[in-house]
Amino acid sequence: MPSYLRNLVWATLAAGLVSAAPTPSRVSDLTKKSSSTCTFSSAASASASKSSCSTIVLSNIEVPAGKTLDLTDLKDGTKVIFEGTTTFGYKEWSGPLIKISGSDITVEAADGAVINADGSRWWDGEGTNGGKTKPKFFYAHSLDDSTISGLNIKNTPVQAFSIQSDNLIIDGVTIDNSDGDENGGHNTDGFDISESTGVTIRNAVVKNQDDCIAINSGQNIYFTGGTCSGGHGLSIGSVGGRDDNTVKNVTITDSTVTDSANGVRIKTVYDATGSVSDVTFSDITVSGITDYGIVIEQDYENGSPTGTPTSGVPITDLTVKGITGSVESDAVEVYILCGDDACSDWTWSGVDITSGQTSSKCENVPSGASC
């Protein structure tokens, strides 16, 4: 081949290679899409691009008023990391402020990270009973085979965690709503669990103005190493009046409850149906309790006791052991109010609650228990 033809062929091939190469902006786009770790500084971008990332870093997110930090339907195995301070704009609405769902998801916090809901903007002493409409904080619904660990949460407007999941572990989470003690915090439950199987909560610190944990339905639930203060104590219920009204195989153990209305509590709904079975409260220390050290009652209606128990939600195979400590002088140490034949197969041992009063209004106390 003549030399001028060889030069022409090589020039043509080189031009084709240059034209086939991506432009610099295209290379950048490809790099972003192939990256497994995505760092977001806005809620909208995190929600829009969540499916492209195996690790999502939420860096100093400011969630707009009336919007949810929506990380639902994450791809399996995604890790979510809260970094810096996460904040939320103010609006009267029902929320939630955060919702996360998926399978095999890990949710955790970087060192020093805080999720600050600044609930004082909504607090008015009414909670969910009236006044301002307040957003729920965190929906862990369909967050299955997953883990939430190390979150540091401040001042939720009302309830913190709503849990409807299977095989979920929550470890080392702090919910600090103590500012609400003097500023109108109300109904600031720590963990509300319903329609769930296999939930484990370990080493939680909850400072609030309602239940530390409330199990309304579900099975195979384990709460251990909890530190609860300021609220309504460790609760089963209220059970009854919902789509699912069964609580089964629950253990609440190795925890402390201080400066709260109740120590441990089971409450079922008046004239409702359902069941509570295989529940264990063990090795719990109480102090500074203002209402009841232990309270088990089957008379709730519209969120308040009626004084008249019914038998539609039996409480069976209950173990209460190693519940110790003190209540205030005008509080009741133990109160049991059961419907006819509605409480049976109870084991009661090592209960030593002092400094309060003995109730004369207990009814149908089952064999083995004392009131």
Swiss-Prot record:
BP term (GO), one: cell wall organization
Pfam family, one: Glyco_hydro_28
Gene Ontology MF annotations: polygalacturonase activity
Prosequence residues removed at maturation: 20-34
Disulphides: C38-C53, C212-C228, C338-C343, C362-C371
Reactions catalysed according to its record: (1,4-alpha-D-galacturonosyl)n+m + H2O = (1,4-alpha-D-galacturonosyl)n + (1,4-alpha-D-galacturonosyl)m
Signal peptide region: 1-19
Bilayer-crossing regions: none
PROSITE patterns assigned to the protein according to its UniProt record, in alphabetical order: POLYGALACTURONASE (PS00502)
Superkingdom, taxonomy of origin: Eukaryota
Main location: secreted
GO cellular component, one term: extracellular region
Active site per the UniProt annotation: D210, H232
Alphabetical list of InterPro entries matching this protein: Glyco_hydro_28, Glycosyl_hydrlase_28, PbH1, Pectin_lyas_fold, Pectin_lyase_fold/virulence
Glycosylation sites: N249
Enzyme Commission designation: 3.2.1.15
PANTHER family found in the cross-reference section: ENDOPOLYGALACTURONASE B, POLYGALACTURONASE
Family assignment from sequence similarity: Belongs to the glycosyl hydrolase 28 family.
Name of the protein described by the UniProt record: Polygalacturonase
